[in-house]
């Protein structure tokens, strides 16, 4: 390929202009790694010793805490004879590689291991000969030498740090990574990963970022040793009776998942030490699989990320984040993952803040205002749905065939919809005799405790009385507290105050927290920050028992005397979670009280456990949440927060209206464990609308409510003058869809990886459906006769299963003439738009219906958005089944002022949907079973292998390199409109090889990985500069292996071509 050779020559020529060349000598070695090294000298963090033993103790069929791994080690020079020591806290990560923009980085890699590996870097520029990743990319000869480094071989990888990374709005130095990429998930699980720090030019002084005293790199990962290349070696070496090991046994597999930070678990990570008042930079990243939903909490500290104050950092596989803090409060503090499953499994560490007598700034808390709250924890019987009916369907909760029956059926071994719980409630004084009654504005709080609010400069005093039967506490977020006021206990003694963290039954304790400036909103934040408080004795059990409440921390002078925000009409607090009543402190009480045959209850039974997982908002399900009422044109603030585990990946969708969050216009907010958000909304359409979780299991499980917008303050009119109307003729058409029409790319990939693996999703075999399915898709037609389908142009080929790309400008209307050419009712509805009615009428088979979408200002980009932003449109007759049957497409809304015509660069746009299509939920499942398997009569729709085989990990409905048409030229300006929908497993960290992209988020930021979840729509802007065929994939382990990968091609520009 001539243009690739030319590209390489251009890079060599341009290297003369680079300011500095740096050399790193890295060897790939094999060693035994101890996940709890040094734990003999110090007590591990574990609520339950049995829990830590499960992961760390070896035995006849258990490996324990030591594993053979492959590691990146740094050497002094090219002789590879002397290693360079690294900080203890780096754990098994490779050495820190640092570069400033303009640097040429030469990484000399030698493989001392027993199998082939590579070195692949994120965030830097490289040619195909320096990519270090093996996949079918049309390269040959010398460009393939980097793809696989065999034992004993050495290779020089040449990387260049250049714009746009870091972006203009990024920190001076940002987090990137490098890892081996023969089979990336297996290589990484084996240990080959390390940090790469990219810095703006001139920001490093003696290899340290200026104005930073301490810096640390942390990887949060559930390291899956079952995927390691060395699993067999580890079984033979560390199991005392290896012949007894069943590698498919679920408990054995779980025992090999190490919930770790830099390869250390249960608090054994060494060396995180700093002085009070040190300016500390944390370079953080996640890695792993669908279970890797991380919510990192730095206890006792205030963090700044992208100019926002926060105390929780959410990380997913290949999420790359940097945060800064000024260390405060001398003592030993915990750094923990607040995913409740991870917390139990050991994903914690300690960091020490020492008093080094460094001068501290003057206390900025003057004219201290003390806000005093009297809060008790008390028992109550909580009904998740007091109306007894699903307000969305009008059905009784226990109707046969209803989604709700599994949760609300009460009987011999079922609890039903009411549970004994512990809740926080507010009282008038410390006698705790007169409970404060909630007013109409607080009706919606439901199970939540009272709102604790404060302004910057305030002192919060909470007198807490425990009326329950277990030790409890109150642990706040978003405020400052001393060790004596910390509501979370973590031993050994001396690290926590037992008095504050274990308030005994019938006892009272008064907490005091402060709100210094660094804990309050920044200039970029909203006026008030959404926060939460909860009991922290046993975080999992306490929260699931019901002990959680909302907080808001506001700018000074922004609140009225009663705590309401000035210039805001209404404030609502929403807590989305799957309350796992199996983890409740009161489970046994509930079994005794509500089941009719408690002695027959098997608490380990999966069906029993599922019946106790209550998908709720503020403790209500299926539209039973009261009090979400507002007026047209009012200024509304929503405070959202969540808690839970990896199942708690929420896309909270507000139908009928949009909101602003940090300058971005959206209608769906993504929540994760312990994440909180503040959303600003001005409702402009009258009616009853949905606020619901788009995660499909949560939606069907009842995490959906109604909010009502009324005309109540005179006439509120939409004054938008809609100019121009564009008409689209779109039909729902049933087709045979092939997720993988060619297996060539997939087969060549496995050949290059020297693996012979079957494919559970595409191999038809005797009972499985294979790659072809009957589906229904949106297709565009030329006119209202619906006789001639519009043929897709070359630049639209990439849309695949998606419906047509619909464009609209702010101030215009879109008229969709929709014909249902399928065999069952469907509709077409778009996110973000304004419609005359809050309901979307179904269109019956054979019918034609016209839908009008208005595009007011609030449908377009926010002040901090890209000029054009994507929304999704889909059918809403049955939101879940319609989606999985294939009905979804992109709507792109651009600002009025956005001019595309005069840009000298060629503008390209590609729309991508990352979705695990669950064909088990398709309307056409029975048709597909009858059509495609060789023996349909033998298929069992409840068989786990059959169910798994129908989950198609696709990009625009294509798998394993089958998505075609992602072609561009060097010098093009490319907009990627990326969307995600789906279920709990649909967390997608989208990674582009070869190029970084930019995105807007209160400034221009750069990365090569972006996180997507159900209801995430984002514009990514790319300026291709390096020719080649490049990998584009989801970085989640199972999704890579399941086929959520394709390639995009960058051709040389016209000048290069002609020259």
Curated annotation (Swiss-Prot):
Output the superkingdom of the source species.
Answer: Eukaryota
Q: In which tissues is it expressed?
A: Synthesized in liver and secreted into the plasma. Also choroid plexus, yolk sac, placenta, and testis; not in stomach and small intestine. Fetal lung and liver.
Q: What induces it?
A: By inflammation.
Binding locations of Cu(2+) 6: 988, 1034, 1039, 1044
Residues the record lists as binding Cu(2+) 4: 294, 337, 342
Q: Which residues bind Na(+) 1?
A: 55, 64, 67, 255
- UniProt: Ca(2+) binding residues: 128, 143, 146-147
GO biological process per UniProt: female pregnancy; intracellular copper ion homeostasis; intracellular iron ion homeostasis; lactation; liver development; lung development; mammary gland involution; plasma membrane copper ion transport
Residues that, per the record, bind O2: 120, 179, 991, 993, 1035
Q: Where do the annotations place Na(+) 3 binding?
A: 761, 770, 773, 949
What is the reaction catalyzed? 4 Fe(2+) + O2 + 4 H(+) = 4 Fe(3+) + 2 H2O; 4 Cu(+) + O2 + 4 H(+) = 4 Cu(2+) + 2 H2O; a hydroperoxide + 2 glutathione = an alcohol + glutathione disulfide + H2O; 4 nitric oxide + O2 + 2 H2O = 4 nitrite + 4 H(+)
| Active-site residues, record numbering mapped to chain | 693
Coiled coil (residue ranges): none
* Segment forming the signal sequence: 1-19
Tell me where it resides.
Answer: Secreted
A Pfam family reported for this protein in Swiss-Prot or TrEMBL: Cu-oxidase
Binding sites annotated in the UniProt record for Cu(2+) 3: 181, 993, 1033
Is Disulfide bond among the key words of this record?
yes
Documented EC number(s): 1.16.3.4, 1.16.3.1, 1.11.1.9, 1.11.1.27
Free-text remark on how the cofactor is bound = Binds 6 Cu(2+) cations per monomer.
Instruction: Quote the subunit structure annotation.
Output: Found in a complex with MPO and LTF; interacts directly with MPO and LTF, which allows Fe(3+) incorporation into LTF, activation of CP ferroxidase activity and protection of CP antioxidant properties by MPO.
Protein name (database record): Ceruloplasmin
């Amino acid at each position: 390929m001539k243009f690739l050779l030319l590209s390489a020559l251009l890079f060599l020529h341009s290297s003369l202009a680079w300011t500095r060349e740096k050399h790193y000598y890295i060897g790939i070695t094999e060693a035994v790694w101890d996940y709890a090294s040094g734990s003999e000298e110090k007590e591990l963090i574990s609520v339950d010793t049995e829990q830590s033993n499960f992961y760390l103790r070896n035995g006849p069929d258990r490996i324990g805490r030591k594993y053979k791994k492959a590691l990146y080690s740094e050497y002094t020079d090219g002789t590879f004879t002397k290693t360079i020591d690294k900080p203890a806290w780096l754990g098994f990560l490779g050495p820190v590689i640092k570069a400033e923009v303009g640097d040429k980085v030469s990484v000399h890699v030698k493989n001392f291991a027993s199998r082939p590996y590579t070195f692949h870097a994120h965030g830097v520029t490289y040619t195909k000969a320096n990519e270090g990743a093996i996949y079918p990319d049309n390269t040959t000869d010398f460009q393939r030498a980097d793809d696989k480094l065999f034992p004993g071989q050495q290779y020089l990888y040449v990387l260049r740090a250049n714009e746009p990374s870091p972006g203009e709005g990024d920190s001076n130095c940002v987090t990137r990574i490098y890892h081996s990429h023969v089979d990336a998930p297996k290589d990484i699980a084996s240990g080959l990963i390390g940090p790469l720090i990219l810095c703006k030019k001139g920001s490093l002084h003696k290899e340290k970022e200026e104005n930073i005293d301490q810096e640390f790199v942390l990887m949060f990962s559930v390291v899956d040793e079952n995927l390691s290349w060395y699993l067999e070696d580890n079984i033979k070496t560390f199991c005392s009776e290896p012949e007894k090991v069943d590698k498919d046994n679920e408990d054995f597999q779980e025992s090999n998942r190490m919930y770790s930070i830099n390869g250390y678990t249960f608090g054994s990570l060494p060396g995180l030490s700093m002085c009070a008042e040190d300016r500390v930079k944390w370079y953080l990243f996640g890695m792993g699989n669908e279970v890797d939903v991380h919510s990192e909490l730095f206890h006792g500290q205030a963090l700044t990320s992208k100019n926002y104050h926060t105390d929780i950092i959410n990380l997913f596989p290949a999420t790359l984040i940097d945060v800064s803090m000024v260390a405060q409060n001398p003592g030993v503090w915990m750094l923990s993952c607040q995913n409740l499953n991870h917390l139990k499994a050991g994903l914690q560490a300690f960091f020490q803040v020492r008093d080094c007598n460094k001068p501290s700034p003057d206390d900025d808390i003057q004219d201290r205002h003390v806000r005093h709250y009297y809060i008790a924890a008390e028992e109550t019987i909580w009904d998740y749905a007091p109306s007894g009916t699903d307000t969305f369907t009008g059905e009784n909760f226990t109707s046969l065939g209803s989604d709700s029956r599994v949760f609300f059926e009460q009987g011999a071994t079922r609890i039903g919809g009411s549970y004994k719980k512990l809740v926080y409630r507010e009282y008038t004084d410390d006698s705790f005799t007169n409970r404060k009654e909630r007013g109409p504005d607080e009706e919606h709080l439901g199970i939540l405790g009272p709102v604790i609010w404060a302004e910057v400069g305030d002192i919060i005093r909470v007198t807490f009385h425990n009326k329950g039967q277990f030790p409890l506490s109150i642990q706040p977020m978003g405020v400052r507290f001393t060790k004596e006021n910390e509501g979370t206990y973590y031993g050994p003694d001396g690290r926590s105050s037992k008095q504050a963290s274990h308030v005994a039954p019938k006892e009272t304790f008064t907490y005091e927290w402060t709100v210094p400036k660094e804990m309050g909103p920044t200039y970029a934040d909203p006026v008030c920050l959404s926060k939460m408080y909860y009991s922290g004795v046993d975080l999992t059990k306490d929260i699931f028992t019901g002990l959680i409440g909302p907080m808001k921390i506001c700018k000074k002078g922004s609140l009225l005397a009663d705590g309401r925000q000035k210039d805001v009409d209404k404030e609502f607090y929403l807590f989305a979670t799957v309350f796992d009543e199996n983890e409740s402190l009161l489970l046994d009480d509930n079994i005794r009280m509500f089941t009719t045959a408690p002695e027959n209850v098997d608490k380990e039974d999966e069906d029993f456990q599922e019946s106790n997982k209550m998908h709720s908002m503020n403790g209500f399900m299926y539209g039973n949440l009261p009090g979400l009422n507002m007026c047209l044109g009012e200024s509304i603030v929503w405070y959202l927060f969540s808690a839970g585990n990896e199942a708690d990946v929420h896309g909270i969708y507000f139908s009928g209206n949009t909101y602003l969050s940090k300058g971005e216009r959206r209608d769906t907010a993504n929540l994760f464990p312990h994440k909180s958000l503040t959303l600003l909304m001005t409702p402009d359409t009258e009616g009853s609308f949905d606020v619901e979780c788009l995660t499909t299991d949560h939606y069907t499980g009842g995490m959906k409510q109604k909010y009502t917008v009324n005309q109540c303050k005179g006439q509120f009119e939409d004054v938008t003058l809609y100019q121009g109307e564009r008409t689209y003729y779109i039909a729902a058409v049933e087709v045979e869809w092939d997720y993988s029409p060619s297996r060539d790319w997939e087969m060549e990939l496995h050949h290059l990886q020297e693996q012979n693996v079957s494919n559970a999703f595409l191999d038809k075999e005797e009972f499985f459906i294979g790659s072809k399915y009957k589906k229904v898709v949106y297709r565009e037609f030329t006119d209202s006769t619906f006789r001639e389908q519009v043929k897709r142009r070359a630049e639209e080929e990439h849309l695949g299963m998606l419906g047509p790309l619909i464009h609209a400008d702010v101030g215009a209307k879109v008229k969709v003439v929709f014909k249902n050419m399928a065999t069952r009712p469907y509709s077409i509805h778009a996110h973000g738009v304004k419609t005359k009615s809050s309901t979307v009428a179904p269109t019956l088979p054979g019918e034609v219906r016209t839908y009008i979408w208005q595009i007011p200002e609030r449908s377009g980009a926010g002040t901090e958005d890209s000029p054009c932003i994507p929304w999704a449109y889909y059918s809403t007759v049955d939101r879940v089944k319609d989606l999985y049957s294939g009905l979804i497409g992109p709507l792109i809304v651009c600002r009025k002022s956005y001019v595309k015509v005069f840009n000298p660069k060629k503008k390209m746009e590609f729309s991508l949907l990352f979705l695990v299509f669950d064909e088990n939920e398709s309307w056409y499942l029975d048709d597909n079973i009858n059509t495609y398997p060789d023996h349909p009569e033998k298929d069992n729709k409840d068989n786990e292998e059959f169910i798994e085989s129908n989950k198609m990990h696709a990009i625009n409905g294509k798998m394993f390199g089958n998505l075609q048409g992602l072609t561009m030229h060097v010098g093009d300006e490319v907009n990627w409109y990326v969307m995600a929908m789906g279920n709990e497993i649909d967390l997608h960290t989208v990674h582009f090889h070869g190029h970084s992209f930019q995105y807007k988020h209160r400034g221009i930021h750069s990365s090569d990985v972006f996180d997507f979840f159900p209801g995430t729509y984002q514009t990514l802007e790319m300026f291709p500069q390096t020719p080649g065929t490049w990998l584009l994939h989801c970085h989640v382990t199972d999704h890579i292996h399941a086929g959520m990968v394709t390639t995009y091609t960058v051709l040389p520009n016209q000048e290069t071509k002609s020259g």
